[in-house]
Amino acid sequence: MATGADVRDILELGGPEGDAASGTISKKDIINPDKKKSKKSSETLTFKRPEGMHREVYALLYSDKKDAPPLLPSDTGQGYRTVKAKLGSKKVRPWKWMPFTNPARKDGAMFFHWRRAAEEGKDYPFARFNKTVQVPVYSEQEYQLYLHDDAWTKAETDHLFDLSRRFDLRFVVIHDRYDHQQFKKRSVEDLKERYYHICAKLANVRAVPGTDLKIPVFDAGHERRRKEQLERLYNRTPEQVAEEEYLLQELRKIEARKKEREKRSQDLQKLITAADTTAEQRRTERKAPKKKLPQKKEAEKPAVPETAGIKFPDFKSAGVTLRSQRMKLPSSVGQKKIKALEQMLLELGVELSPTPTEELVHMFNELRSDLVLLYELKQACANCEYELQMLRHRHEALARAGVLGGPATPASGPGPASAEPAVTEPGLGPDPKDTIIDVVGAPLTPNSRKRRESASSSSSVKKAKKP
């Protein structure tokens, strides 16, 4: 049974005071008009949602609770008032117009700039970027013992090293400032070769035994060849550029044909291997003694064995299926092969949809697989014969033109024009584009042969139209 304290807790009344201390509840405790007034006074002022406005939109505009923090940092404390600059309470650091000297200059020039007063007397901050190249210095004795060269005098070598220190080994500038009137005219490669040769000699002479040497090496011959090749590349004529682009295109075509031919040969090898494997398996199956198995175990064997030509679907775990579905050709067999397969079955007098018994399904699938394999082998054989014939004609044409290194032989075809040897006028040799030998071969399709014949006929018509 509920006590007075439970009732007070449910009604949210105060603690045990007056009558409540004795455990009894009075009418005043239940009504409690003072508490209701305090609740009303404590309620905050709310705004009513306007009519026609959705609750979600109104919740975005107004909320009884505090607004959510913004996604981007912002300063909304000032409202629409002009925001004043928040300056620090510290004093401004004084600046001073003071002189300075640049350590990179040797003439002692004086400059002025603004700088903080606390930094007076410090070094110029950009002096640390004054990096110079360490050019070796040699003595008269070292030059006579190790650095003497008949092609270079001592004065010319000193002049080279002086310019190297002044211009930080910028050899193009050194070559421009070189005194060609007093000394022999030198190229940039000659100056580099002499400088690095002396550096390597001094490094070997001054090296401490047992230390790893970092000897600078400069190949002047390689540099000269590189510049010569770049100059030739730059001085190419538009005809040479076009011929080079044509040769690159022909090279890409030859490489593509080579890859296609290799792929075809691999496919052909797979077909031959598959045919041999299938024939060997069937010989083994015929020699093996057949044992009669119970009906249950016979149903457990795979419905269709894996064949070389066509891989039929396996319905081992597909539930209840019709046996005729096992004879359905997979989608991987193209329409062209399907039509050829049907034509071969009609020529053999075999029904296209025989009665789907267990033995007939197995044998019918094997027959169609062998027929597809035979069809692919015939196609590969025809392609090889076409390629062989095309290469034979090309070899004969090149032999008649004398491209293969031997004398030009007259054509063996009928007609008066074919009996005469090929005569070429001086200066009008065969087009280099027409004499390119494709050692790989063209694509093995009759369409490519038709395209080549049409292209050759059009080129001959163009030559005939020229005056």
Swiss-Prot record:
GO biological process: chromatin remodeling; DNA repair; negative regulation of DNA-templated transcription; negative regulation of transcription by RNA polymerase II; positive regulation of DNA-templated transcription; positive regulation of double-strand break repair via homologous recombination; positive regulation of protein import into nucleus; regulation of apoptotic process
Highest rank taxon of the organism: Eukaryota
Compositional bias annotation for Basic and acidic residues: 1-11, 26-48, 258-267
Pfam families: DMAP1, SANT_DAMP1_like
Any GO molecular function: transcription corepressor activity
Protein name (record): DNA methyltransferase 1-associated protein 1
Keyword field contains Phosphoprotein: yes
Residue numbers spanned by region Disordered: 1-48, 258-305, 404-467
